[in-house]
Amino acid sequence: MDNYTYSELLKSLQNKCDNIALIIKPEKIKQELERIEKEQEDPNFWQDVLKARDTNKEKVRLNRLLETYQKTKNSLDESVELFELAQNDNDEVTLSLLYEEAPILENSVQKVEIEIMLSGENDASNAIITIQPGAGGTESQDWASILYRMYLRWAERRGFKSEILDYQDGEEAGIKGVAFIIKGENAYGYLKNENGVHRLVRISPFDANAKRHTSFASVQISPELDDDIDIEIDEKDVRYDYYRSSGAGGQHVNKTESAVRITHFPTGIVVQCQNDRSQHKNKASALKMLKSKLYELELEKQQSSAKNEEKSEIGWGHQIRSYVLAPYQQVKDARSNTAYSNVEAILDGDIDAILEGVLIAKA
C-alpha cells in the first residue's frame, strides 16, 4: 500500500461513516436513550412486563449501535489525523503501521454497516431452521446432516442456544430432515438469507469407486414470532396427524403418538414436531412453526410486490451456494459472488464472513 491508496481508502471510509450518520442519526439515538432511561425510572414501568422487556431490548440495541458507531468514527478520525502528521513529518514507521491496520479499520466500518442491516422488524428474533435433503438418498441425507452441524457449530461459536423441534434419521447415514430453533440476538437477521438450495460436490465416502458426486439440500429460515404477533389459521385449512416419536438419533422412542404433523392446505406447508414427550407441547411448537412460515411467506409476497417482481422460488431451482470439496476446495456464494477457500472451517461453523458478505451484497 502507498500514500495515495491509503488516502483514497480513508476518503471512502469517511464517506461511508457520513452516510451511516445520516441513517442512524446519533443525536436522535442519544435523545431516545435518555427518554427510555426516564421511562424506566417510573415506578409503574414493570407493570406491563412485555412492554418493559421490549423497551429493554431496544435500549440494548441502541446502546450497542451508538457505541459501535462512535468507536469506529473515533478510530477513523484518529487515523486521518495520524496520516496527515506522518505525511508532513515523512514518518515512514507510522505510515507503515497505518497501512498494516487498514484492514482492521475497514472491518470496523463494515461492522457498523451490518448493525444497521440487522435492524429489520424481525432481525432480532430467534431463527427457526428447516433442512431437507434433495434427491439422491444417502448422499443428500448425509449432506443435510453436515449442514445441520454447520449451523449448530455457528450457534455455539456465538454463544447461542439451539433446540430440536423435529429430527428424522436417514436410512444409512445422515438425516431425512430436521427442524430446530437457534436462540440468540439477531439469529434470524444473520441467517435469513440462508433460504435456498445448498449444493455439495465431493468424492463420495459411500461410493466404492470413489467417484465425484453432487448433492443438494434445501434450507428454510423463518423468525420465531413473539406471542403478541397474531397470525390467524382457519381450522378447516389444516390437518393434524399424530404419530409415534422416534426422537433425535433414534433415542427415547415413545409408545404413545406424541409427535405432531400439521399440513396447511392453502400453501402446502407441512410442519412437524416430536421434540417433547407431550403431544400438547409438540402441537403448540408445530403451530408456532407454521405461523412463522406463514408470516415469512406473507413478508416475501409484500417485498416482491413492492419491488414489482415475481416471488423468487425457494425450491430446487434456487441455488444460493456451492461447496466444492473435489477436485479443488472452495465455497462460493451466488448472491455476493464471493469465493472462500477455508472450506473445512466453514463446514465447522465459521460462516460469519459469508453471512455478512451476503447482507452487504443485498443492502
Swiss-Prot record:
It comes from the Bacteria. Keywords: Cytoplasm, Methylation, Protein biosynthesis. Methylated by PrmC. Methylation increases the termination efficiency of RF2. The keyword Cytoplasm applies. It holds the Pfam family PCRF. It is found in: Cytoplasm. GO terms for cellular component: cytoplasm. GO terms for molecular function: translation release factor activity, codon specific. Signal peptide: none annotated. SUPFAM superfamilies: Release factor. The modification N5-methylglutamine is found at residue 251. Belongs to the prokaryotic/mitochondrial release factor family. Peptide chain release factor 2 directs the termination of translation in response to the peptide chain termination codons UGA and UAA. This is Peptide chain release factor 2. The lineage of its organism: Bacteria, Pseudomonadati, Campylobacterota, Epsilonproteobacteria, Campylobacterales.
